[in-house]
């Protein structure tokens, strides 16, 4: 996971660095000057979270410390509570103090949030007090509207991939760009009883500005990859998807080198297992991206190898493994 996160971060231009020892043609003095100029002082807020989260974050810190020594960086850490750990200690999934600490940081490194939804007492609480409510609130407070989820098949994991060898072929490498702060998860919701019948309502809302900014991110990433964007929607049914498709087509005009195709979400779910090699950047809304990114992660052979970044319109980001909290193996020291 950590190696993939570093590779992924460089690809997305979220870490500015100079790889000193590969600067062919530069003198030793010039390399040392480049090394000095690339040194960073970083303040990273860590959210160990729940389940295996604390174990994962502890190992990640060890790797970051080695990187800091190797390249002369200075990294300071501040741990904050979120999710179930915060509920147990503070009575709420995310405190104002934790939000302030995250806003003051250069980046956030998160482990995992939540527990067993069937047995944990956290899930007997009202929805706004459950572990995941803290993560949703943090995304909104930090304006983390762009979620990047790579799905890459390592040759060492080919045998773990559930797809046939003729489908895998030469492997696949895709990036799922998911809008993260709009749509169904952030719309108005209610549950009420009318004439003796319980009715639940969730609202799916998108503005053209919300769609435009995630589309720009998606096309920017595509320019650094194989220059293809697959925009996924449900435009044959949903008004929000018809607006999505219209705005994405407008953004595409500014990227003539990028090939744009539209795909309905149900077809995309099928194509991910039928021919994953066809995808480069998948651009989609919040709920569709939530589902498709988990599906894509499983055809790689192990979700434990995959990373996730949630970004705003600056270089700030929240970085985490794609896997869950795995409470059944927490504390055993066997988490990947």
Task: Tell me the role of every PLM-derived stretch.
Residues 87-201, 287-289:
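N-terminal glycine-rich phosphate/adenylate-binding segment common to multiple enzyme folds
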Residues 50-53, 106, 177, 218, ...:
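Buried hydrophobic positions in well-ordered alpha/beta secondary-structure cores of metabolic enzymes
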Residues 84, 272-335:
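Glycine-rich phosphate/nucleotide-binding loop
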Residues 39-44:
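Extreme N-terminal starter segment of soluble prokaryotic enzymes
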Residues 18-20, 28:
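Short hydrophobic alpha-helical segments enriched in small aliphatic residues
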Residues 45-61, 67, 196-266:
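Glycine-rich phosphate/diphosphate-binding loop of Rossmann-like nucleotide-binding domains
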Residues 72-95, 272:
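N-terminal beta-loop-helix "entrance" segment that forms/cooperates
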